[in-house]
Regions:
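Amphipathic alpha-helical protein-protein interaction segments
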Residues: 2-5, 419-420, 435-690, 715-719, ...
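A domain-level signal for caspase-like cysteine endopeptidase catalytic cores
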Residues: 197, 675-677, 708-788, 823, ...
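Residue register of alpha-helical TPR repeats
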Residues: 13-14, 51, 91, 127, ...
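Residue signature of alpha-solenoid helical repeat architecture, marking inter-repeat boundaries
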Residues: 10, 47, 87, 123, ...
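Caspase-like cysteine protease fold
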Residues: 789, 794-817, 863-924
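Amphipathic alpha-helical segments of tetratricopeptide repeats
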Residues: 36-40, 75-84, 114-121, 150-161, ...
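Single-residue signature of alpha-solenoid repeat helices
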Residues: 31, 69, 109, 145, ...
């Protein structure tokens, strides 16, 4: 009788072990717990123990512990062999192969698979073949991997039609499709990859395999990243992450999520975040002992360093990754790492007139290796580099061969690939002496970039997209400068300048959720500030705010873009007509030299200005002395000394930037800066005194915005015309944030300027929601508040209101905006300048949303000292003057008063935008 219970326990243990094995793909943590429970029983018979060890090993591998999994599965295979469980032993070897691969034992992994395949038949053998395909993919043997997947699929498809459930393997088919999908992406077969991944997801859903469902979403996100649809990729990554979190530790069950997100961040130009993600992925992989993942993460980190211009760090990480790949027999990945290393070497000397000859030979070898291993996109990029270097060395034969190969992908693949191919084609035509053909190729490449940018809804992603077309614009500008035609130089200088501002604004998705995140961030930031003021530790509030910033950025990036690209081209004839008697100055930087195109009375002239390095130093001196002036206002003699130093340095900068232009006297001027020139306090330069001065991010944008008016009718309106801004029917909002010296008095004085029809928000009434509502219901807004420009994260640049900080993200939620905004808030006009003179900051965000003119400071300003200047500006606006004219007259009055405070305020304020006096409210 004693044997009865034991006899019954044997099949129960086997059933429990089998259940644990079946659970691995769905919930590896629970599968591990169940397998351990079976193994703890001394009565467990050999087959049940083998299956439990198999389940435990697979669960360990799924939770990113490949070393532990290898040891467990090795013991399982040994035990199965000793008890003559041949089928179990063979299938365990299939699982063991991936653990061996992950821990660097590539040859052993392939031997285990060979042994397994010989011992298996039917769908079990197909699983072994699938596993070999996955191993080949990890080795970089992409075509071999595809062949194995296709061979295994045939067996699994045949079994799919049988009525015998034991002969079918729908889960095996789903896993095959999910593994083949990313391989097809790497081979450039995006449509076929999408079919695989969608079918894999449907099968996984039907089978109730939650972990596999998450992985199909993860791989679809990878596909959309390569396709260039970043908002869709972000949404899919978010969905996959939520599914992973519902199952267990994301870091353990999805160790590649970090590296794949890093690739997305790189594609979006978010370099700092990408580098952080790659560094974290390296650390996670080192902890887990997954040598393959470590090497791949190092390669991504190298790419992040390369994109950031940190060439030494990029080369070091790439070389280290190449060594790791070589040690594990991954020759294809060695080529990929060498590709990144040589990119760092080439880009580091790209401005050199004569690059070292050795680089061409090295690059040619790497391009051939990349092509042989199936890395087509990377081979194209290297061939483009080879062509450029060969042109510099006069080896046109080498250049033509390399560029012809690189140009083959003009009409297929991702946006980045097509842009690179058009660049190669332009270079090839340039070498052949076909300059018109080269320009057509450049314009085609930039059109691809415009279409790609239009897909993006988030301002941040749109601004970063210009980096993909930097080389195209550089070559186009070079051709124009060589030919010396000022109008062509202006057109090419404009072609990528602040192009993101030409697109219609996109309201971020999930508005209620984003609003909640912003409110919580405001509270956390406020808590940190109050703790600091009270002498307490602000670390808790800062940490919460930092976490919320990441969530806000992620949510805002989900916005869908427009259906069609905006036309960013500059029509010089239309621009000349709309300028009237004004003068346009567009600054252009090329190879370290600053020049300018001056457009006046329909005639364009080209002026050389000087060394960009010297000018940048002068700008730093001017800004430093302006800040010192602002801080010393009210301190008697020290303020006077600071004012004189500021005037002296401003005179030097005026001599460098304005004197060479030889501007006609008395004309209004529109200045289009570039690079560091966006930080210039232009109204401090004497050559621009006594002029209506407008700053615009782009001549084409200024022209297009002015074109939406009805000149010359708008120009002829008298000050008392009811359609003129400031007339009695206009909706005017007056806002003064907290802790402003004289803020309440300033609003009271402005009420007298505009009369009773004003909405006033002062002190506690000036909350974020109240100010946003006022923005949506006003034609003109005056918003005085303490401002803060966030160089580390420009979208969090802010204005301090009664209940916290108003950010660029808040502004982007507006449905309509005023025509004109006056923002006497420190640094409100300061911007972060990205590739292509794309701008991120408070004032640039307002222009994107439809505000036509912004008057704001590009530096610090003293609070109460600005009141006389601001009042004078509003008096001019009330009389119907254009914003630039109102500011110019107010500046003249301030200079006449002659005090240091007047000088500090008048020098910092700028009129930015289209200088538009139209009174209709702009829809965002």
């Amino acid at each position: 009788m004693a044997a009865g219970p034991v006899t019954q326990a044997v099949p129960l243990a086997l059933r429990q072990a089998t259940a644990a094995l079946d659970l691995v793909q769905n919930n590896p943590r629970d599968a591990e717990r169940r397998a351990l429970a079976v193994l703890r029983r001394s009565t467990t018979q050999p087959e049940a123990r083998v299956v439990a060890l198999w389940a435990l090993g697979r669960a360990q591998f799924e939770q990113d512990a490949p070393g532990d999994a290898r040891d467990t599965l090795t013991e399982a295979a040994r035990l199965a062999g000793s008890h003559r469980l041949a089928n179990h032993a063979a299938q365990i070897r299939v699982s063991l192969s991936m653990c061996l691969m992950a821990t660097g034992a590539t040859s052993r992994a392939l031997r285990q698979l060979a042994l397994a395949e010989r011992a298996l038949t039917g769908v079990a053998q197909a699983r072994a073949i699938t596993q070999r395909g996955l191993l080949f993919a990890r080795l970089g043997r992409l075509e071999d991997a595809l062949g194995e997947f296709d061979r295994a699929e045939q067996t699994l498809r045949d079994a799919e039609h049988t009525r015998d459930e034991h002969e079918r393997d729908d889960l095996g088919l789903a896993r095959l499709l999910n593994n083949r999908g990313p391989l097809l992406v790497m081979l450039g077969h995006l449509a076929r990859a999408e079919v695989d991944l969608r079918e894999a997801g449907e099968l996984a859903e039907r089978l109730g395999q939650r972990l596999l469902v998450a992985r199909t979403l993860h791989n679809r996100a990878f596909l959309e990243t390569r396709r260039g649809d970043l908002p869709k990729a972000l949404r899919l990554y978010d969905a996959a992450t939520r599914d992973y979190q519902s199952i267990g530790d994301v870091e353990a069950i999805a160790p590649t999520l970090g590296t794949d997100r890093c690739e997305l961040l790189l594609a979006g130009g978010l370099i700092g975040e990408a580098a952080d993600a790659a560094a974290q992925a390296v650390a996670v992989s080192v902890r887990s002992g997954n040598v393959l993942a470590v090497a791949e993460a190092r390669l991504l980190l190298a790419r992040a360093h390369l994109t950031a211009g940190e060439f030494g760090a990029a080369s070091a990480q790439a070389i280290e990754a190449a060594g790791a790949f070589k040690r594990t027999g991954r020759s294809s990945w060695v080529a990929l790492a060498n590709y990144v290393a040589i990119q760092a070497d080439i880009v580091a000397i790209q401005d050199s007139r004569r690059p070292p000859r050795r680089l061409i030979g090295q690059a040619t070898t790497i391009a051939r290796q990349l092509a042989d291993h199936g890395w087509r996109v990377e081979a194209l990029h290297v061939n483009t580099f080879i062509g450029r270097m060969a042109i510099a060395l006069g080896r046109l034969d080498i250049a033509e061969a390399a560029l012809a190969t690189a140009g083959d992908a003009r009409h297929r693949g991702t946006a980045d690939l097509r842009v690179s191919a058009w660049h190669a084609t332009a270079l090839l035509r340039f070498v052949a002496g076909d300059r018109p053909g080269a320009k057509r190729a450049l314009l085609s490449g930039l059109s691809v970039l415009d279409e790609h940018r239009a897909l993006l809804g988030a301002t941040e992603l749109r601004a970063h997209a210009a980096s993909h077309g930097a080389e195209l614009a550089r070559l186009g500008l070079r051709l124009a400068l060589d030919e010396g035609r000022p109008r062509d130089i202006l057109v090419w200088a404009e072609r990528t300048r602040a192009a993101a501002l030409h697109l219609p604004p996109v309201r971020p998705p999930d508005d209620d959720e984003l609003a909640d995140l912003l409110a919580r961030w405001r509270q956390a930031s406020q808590d940190a500030r109050e703790a600091t003021l009270d002498g307490d530790d602000p670390a808790g509030g800062r940490h919460r705010a930092q976490l919320l910033e990441g969530q806000i950025r992620a949510k805002a990036r989900l916005a869908w873009g427009a259906k069609a690209a905006a036309d960013a081209a500059c029509d010089v004839a239309a621009l000349a007509r709309r300028l009237g008697d004004r003068v346009l100055v567009e600054y252009v930087e090329f190879e370290g030299e600053l020049s300018a195109v001056v457009l006046s009375a329909g005639r364009a002239t080209f002026r050389r200005v000087g060394s960009m390095t010297d000018i940048a130093n002068e700008i730093d001196f001017v800004r430093f002395n302006h800040q010192r002036l602002a801080l010393t206002v009210g301190r008697g003699g020290s303020a006077g000394l600071a004012a004189q130093r500021f005037l002296d340095t401003a005179a030097l900068l005026d001599h460098r930037l304005v004197t060479p232009l030889r501007l006609p006297a008395g004309r209004g001027v529109i200045v289009v800066p570039t690079g560091v020139l966006h930080a210039v306090p232009w109204n401090a330069l004497s050559g621009l005194h006594d002029r209506d001065l407008t700053i615009s991010p782009s001549a084409a944008l200024w022209c297009r915005t002015r074109g939406r008016l009805t000149p010359p009718e708008a120009e002829r309106r008298p000050a008392d015309d009811p359609r003129t801004p400031g007339a009695s029917h206009d909706r005017v909002a007056l806002v003064a944030g907290p802790d402003l010296d004289g803020g309440r008095d300033e609003v009271a004085a402005l009420r007298d300027v505009y009369g009773r029809r004003t909405r006033e928000l002062v002190d506690a009434d000036a909350s974020v929601d109240a100010v946003l509502t006022a923005c949506e219901t006003s034609d003109l807004m005056h918003l005085a508040a303490h401002g803060d420009f966030r160089a580390d994260s420009p979208m969090f640049s802010s204005l301090r209101l009664a209940d916290g900080l108003l950010t660029v993200y808040d502004l982007e939620r507006l449905r309509s905006v005023p025509t004109t905004m006056v923002l006497p808030a420190c640094d409100a006009a300061t911007t972060d300048v990205r590739a292509g003179d794309e701008l991120l900051g408070t004032a640039s965000a307002l222009l994107t949303l439809g505000v036509r003119s912004v008057i704001a400071p590009v530096a610090k300003i003293p609070d109460r000292a600005t009141t006389p200047l601001v009042l004078a500006i509003h008096v001019g606006l009330r009389r119907g003057l254009p914003p630039s004219t109102a500011l110019a007259r107010a500046k003249a009055e301030a200079r006449a008063r002659g005090g240091p405070a007047d000088l500090a305020a008048a020098s910092a304020l700028l009129c930015i935008g289209a200088d538009d006096r139209a009174s209709t409210t702009s829809g965002a």
